[in-house]
Amino acid sequence: MVFDTHLHTLFSTDSKMNIEEAIDAGEKKNLGIIITEHIDLNYPVKGEFVFDIDKYFKEYNKYRSNKVLLGVEIGMGEEIKEQNKSINDKYEFDYVLGSIHLLNGLDLYEKTIYKSSPKKEVFEMYFKTMLACLRCHEYIDSLAHIDYISRYAAYHDGEIYYNEYSDYIDEVLKFIVDREIVIEINTRRLNKKEVCENLMPIYKRYSELGGRFVTIGSDSHYKDSIGLNFKNALKMAENCNLKPVFFEKRLMKYA
């Protein structure tokens, strides 16, 4: 069974979806689901993008099954590496997804990041930050949305072009391949042909460097977007000779 390995319910600050809606949507679309609530301990607004993990397991364990798994999306940061590692070690998540949501302490959603510096400088810093964070979060199962910055980059063209940032992207890809960390195909933006075309060289390069597996995640915060653009993601994986997988009890399984 194919899994949507990245979605958020009410334990995430920015989600309005309850777990029953997520389960129902997964069943209707014949998808397994992994809940990955946000933990961003360095988020600049205190109290946001954190949740009560004990309560999460207490409330959601009854839903756990071979089609409904419980994970977490950890916002990586060098300054919170010890706290994040403690969370990883303490709790029995099925799946730990590692993300970059901040740059120099600012949410990548914030337009001020892009107004103050040229695209090349910001994008290079983004990949440098990603690599630095991966080096102190080697335990994650998958690297989320490598193209996250392109959602919000307030430039005339906010896309990532592999040939422009290949040195930085290759360092990230080599690291995760060496550490056997999987990469996610995030489907949020895959409704656009040009996005698929721009991302394809990154995933092909991952494959060339020895990467074999991908997780596929919608990053859904609403029931209607669970499984969004999965057809395009599965085609991308096939074209790059990558096998879709999911994680249960931190063990990789074939989708």
From Swiss-Prot:
Membrane-spanning residues: none
Family: Belongs to the PHP hydrolase family. HisK subfamily.
Annotated pathway: Amino-acid biosynthesis; L-histidine biosynthesis; L-histidine from 5-phospho-alpha-D-ribose 1-diphosphate: step 8/9
Database matches in InterPro entries: Histidinol_P_phosphatase_HisJ, PHP_dom, Pol/histidinol_Pase-like
Annotated Pfam families: PHP
A GO cellular component annotation in the UniProt record: cytoplasm
Keywords tagged on the record: Amino-acid biosynthesis, Histidine biosynthesis, Hydrolase
Top-level lineage group: Bacteria
Organism: Clostridium acetobutylicum (strain ATCC 824 / DSM 792 / JCM 1419 / IAM 19013 / LMG 5710 / NBRC 13948 / NRRL B-527 / VKM B-1787 / 2291 / W)
EC category: hydrolase
Biological process according to GO: L-histidine biosynthetic process
UniProt KW Hydrolase keyword: yes
EC number annotated for this UniProt entry: 3.1.3.15
Entries under Gene3D superfamilies matching the protein: Metal-dependent hydrolases
Reactions the enzyme catalyzes: L-histidinol phosphate + H2O = L-histidinol + phosphate
GO function term, MF aspect, one: histidinol-phosphatase activity
Gene coding for it: hisK
Name of this protein: Probable histidinol-phosphatase
